[in-house]
From Swiss-Prot:
<dbReference type="GO" id="GO:0009535">
    <property type="term" value="C:chloroplast thylakoid membrane"/>
</dbReference>
<keyword id="KW-0813">Transport</keyword>
<keyword id="KW-0488">Methylation</keyword>
<dbReference type="InterPro" id="IPR038719">
    <property type="entry name" value="Phycobilisome_asu/bsu_sf"/>
</dbReference>
<dbReference type="InterPro" id="IPR009050">
    <property type="entry name" value="Globin-like_sf"/>
</dbReference>
<comment type="subunit">
    <text>Heterodimer of an alpha and a beta chain.</text>
</comment>
<dbReference type="GO" id="GO:0030089">
    <property type="term" value="C:phycobilisome"/>
</dbReference>
<dbReference type="Pfam" id="PF00502">
    <property type="entry name" value="Phycobilisome"/>
</dbReference>
<dbReference type="GO" id="GO:0015979">
    <property type="term" value="P:photosynthesis"/>
</dbReference>
<keyword id="KW-0249">Electron transport</keyword>
<protein>
    <recommendedName>
        <fullName>Allophycocyanin alpha chain</fullName>
    </recommendedName>
</protein>
<keyword id="KW-0150">Chloroplast</keyword>
<dbReference type="InterPro" id="IPR012128">
    <property type="entry name" value="Phycobilisome_asu/bsu"/>
</dbReference>
<comment type="function">
    <text>Light-harvesting photosynthetic bile pigment-protein from the phycobiliprotein complex. Allophycocyanin has a maximum absorption at approximately 650 nanometers.</text>
</comment>
<keyword id="KW-0472">Membrane</keyword>
<keyword id="KW-0042">Antenna complex</keyword>
<keyword id="KW-0602">Photosynthesis</keyword>
Amino acid sequence: MSIVTKSIVNADAEARYLSPGELDRIKSFVLSGQRRLRIAQILTDNRERIVKQGGQQLFQKRPDVVSPGGNAYGEEMTATCLRDLDYYLRLVTYGIVAGDVTPIEEIGLVGVKEMYNSLGTPISGVAVGVKCMKSVACSLLAGEDSAEAGFYFDYTLGAMQ
């Protein structure tokens, strides 16, 4: 839940106006909006590069994934793996834009471990792929922007533990 929604819900539950502290937090959130949008735009503009290089790093670190019998063996399964990585990158951009993990959690992480287990896909391999994408994505950003994006990648990774 965004800081705006959370503040309004809390104030309304107490039948009061927003406090000066809540208004300050909302102001900070709004002022950080341009930065969050810029970060999301950079990641979106570079999504093919991030997914491709992240996938290449995954396959170097985990060659078993693309070896015969691996979950990403063959062209079709490799494409499926890269599609999944792209999905997690998209979720990260949603979180960045919202300034909150709720979209990541509600759209894409509920039942993620169970889903991959039911498919016979080790979640650890998916997590390595997301970690590799984090490395590529954060290399495109500087300082606070990199830390901001890193937070949402880390949140996604935490749900895969």
